[in-house]
Amino acid sequence: MFSKKKKKPLISMPSNFEHRVHTGFDKRENKYVGLPLQWASIVGNNQILKSSNRPLPLVDPSEITPTEILDLKTIVRPHHNNNKADTTSLNSSSTMMMGSMAPMNPMAPGAHPMMSHGPGMMMPPETGGIVLPKTSHVARSNSLRSSSPPRVRRVANVPPSVPEEEGPPAAGTPGVGGASSGGFKPPGAHPSLLYNSQHAHANGATGPLAVRTDQTNLQQYRSNLAPPSGGSMPQQQQTSPVGSVASGTRSNHSHTNNGNSGGSYPPMYPTSHQQQQQQQQQAKQGGDQNQNPLHPHAHPHPHHHQHLAKSASRASSSSGGASSAAQQASGASGGAAGQPKQDQRLTHEQFRAALQMVVSAGDPRENLDHFNKIGEGSTGTVCIATDKSTGRQVAVKKMDLRKQQRRELLFNEVVIMRDYHHPNIVETYSSFLVNDELWVVMEYLEGGALTDIVTHSRMDEEQIATVCKQCLKALAYLHSQGVIHRDIKSDSILLAADGRVKLSDFGFCAQVSQELPKRKSLVGTPYWMSPEVISRLPYGPEVDIWSLGIMVIEMVDGEPPFFNEPPLQAMRRIRDMQPPNLKNAHKVSPRLQSFLDRMLVRDPAQRATAAELLAHPFLRQAGPPSLLVPLMRNARHHP
């Protein structure tokens, strides 16, 4: 009748805790002090972010898109399980959930957008609200950066890049949520990003209890990927896709969880100890998986130098190899998180060696002079210079390897624009490593970004059609090669002096193929994101079409829909509401409205492709590029 009161479990204090970095805020100067070098250009002190009134792209580094559909096996354990068995099963599960940044074919590298910690992921539509991790700022140069919530109207704090997770083989499979990237998560943890304070963690046991808890959570979360009809995905043989871990440090912000239901767990970052274990596992596994992806049970190879050199040599011959080298360099750096400083320096040299295999040899300063800085972003600076041999002006993008949140994304800057040539894509001439900086030499487009035009001018339909036609030609080419841009907006469209339109900023692009037909990362700039990206549903090249439709609204109304609202609220509206309408709908022709309606379709399967849109009657109004020259002149006269 009277049961004995159970004794409360004893919970120890964190062990081996180290307070390595302390960051404060100077109220007098209104800036952060004591920021780590990685964050110095991201939070608080970035003059570019202060002066810019444009929203910033984001990538959410909490998830990675696995390359194959894998169901977690049901594991039945007796109470006397030993640590070894549990640890083995956990490693297997962690391996299954790791994502691949490398493309599945040699056409081009998959761009894996994880650059920083930022505002965040969305909860699946069934669970109610969108939950953003820490606010993220990404400059126009395609880098995610995090900072405080938006204070300026046009500065968007957007969710960080969500590592890619696996998409169902069928395009219509409405899987929601993402697989864990291998990190330990306590009960209730969710891979989505949140405003989340980093908690101290015990140096921790990997015994049966910890493993069983994590395994159970993985199984519970994996169940969210099943179609809503209740049918389970067919079981497939377990494989181990190549993984890459987000190495960027995440900023510490407290958060409030709102509206989690339906079995979804509130997102949570792995603790520092969890990250170290996760990174060490992936660093060990990454080498053999890159070499032999068809044999998932290959044993990890201890010699990272040899694997790095091999993968780097492959990188010089194909873009897929470049991404592979980037992964291994990233994995090595992740594994060195808890190691001495000497190992960290070695990791930097490994990454630099891998990048050196992709870029051109030599020093560009021997052929370039008269450097003049014209811009700065969160990933680096942009200068114009003169080529001594030809006398032409070129643009030089300089990116410091040590200041990148996701330095493997630098491979996209080199490989994508190098391997894909099209009249409407910015031409890259060469790339170099100068000390610890990556220099990308590309054509200089005097006309600037389309943003200057849509902000200061009003475009007529003939000019809008001219821009759209050239953009669609570039997108049709990229999509035919399996490349998704994922950050289409006016900031990514550059104009030459004669009015030619060119697509730029490929730092967030991704590769799809028959083996990996869909992506699920939360990547892009909030106001231009498609509903399926925000909802974390599998998506393909059709997301670029939605973003282009939003850019058309930009050209008509001067800004994208919901631009006066915070990014989180705008994303929620895009996810839950009908496609946005033009403010000045009464001023546009039925042809333009029909053209827009073909792009802003909530169902990706019903959305027009780039090739289909090129045949739309509205584009018959397109004229020569010279139609845009007066708009560029008008934009130059505005500050």
UniProtKB/Swiss-Prot annotation:
Residues 91-129, 138-159, 227-241, 274-295, 309-331 have a biased composition (Low complexity). SUPFAM superfamilies: Protein kinase-like (PK-like) (SSF56112). The modification Phosphothreonine is found at residue 525. Its cofactor is Mg(2+). The modification Phosphoserine is found at residue 521. Its EC number is 2.7.11.1. Residues 11-24 form the CRIB domain. Residues 368-619 form the Protein kinase domain. One of its GO terms (cellular component) is plasma membrane. Expressed in adult brain and eye. High levels detected in developing photoreceptor cells and future bristle cells, and lower levels in cone and pigment cells, as detected in third instar eye imaginal disks (at protein level). Residues 79-195, 222-345 are annotated as: Disordered. InterPro entries: CRIB_dom (IPR000095), CRIB_dom_sf (IPR036936), Kinase-like_dom_sf (IPR011009), PAK3-like (IPR051931), PAK_BD (IPR033923), Prot_kinase_dom (IPR000719), Protein_kinase_ATP_BS (IPR017441). It catalyses: L-seryl-[protein] + ATP = O-phospho-L-seryl-[protein] + ADP + H(+); L-threonyl-[protein] + ATP = O-phospho-L-threonyl-[protein] + ADP + H(+). It is found in: Cell junction, Adherens junction; Cell membrane. Autophosphorylated when activated by Cdc42. It is a peripheral membrane protein. ATP binds at residues 374-382, 397. Residues 25-367 are annotated as: Linker. Its main location: other. Changing residue 525 to A: Strongly reduces autophosphorylation and substrate phosphorylation. GO terms for molecular function: ATP binding; protein kinase activity; protein serine kinase activity; protein serine/threonine kinase activity; small GTPase binding. Involved in neurogenesis of the adult central nervous system, and together with Cdc42, regulates photoreceptor cell morphogenesis. Phosphorylates exogenous substrates when activated by Cdc42. Interacts tightly with GTP-bound but not GDP-bound Cdc42 and weakly with Rac1. This is Serine/threonine-protein kinase PAK mbt.
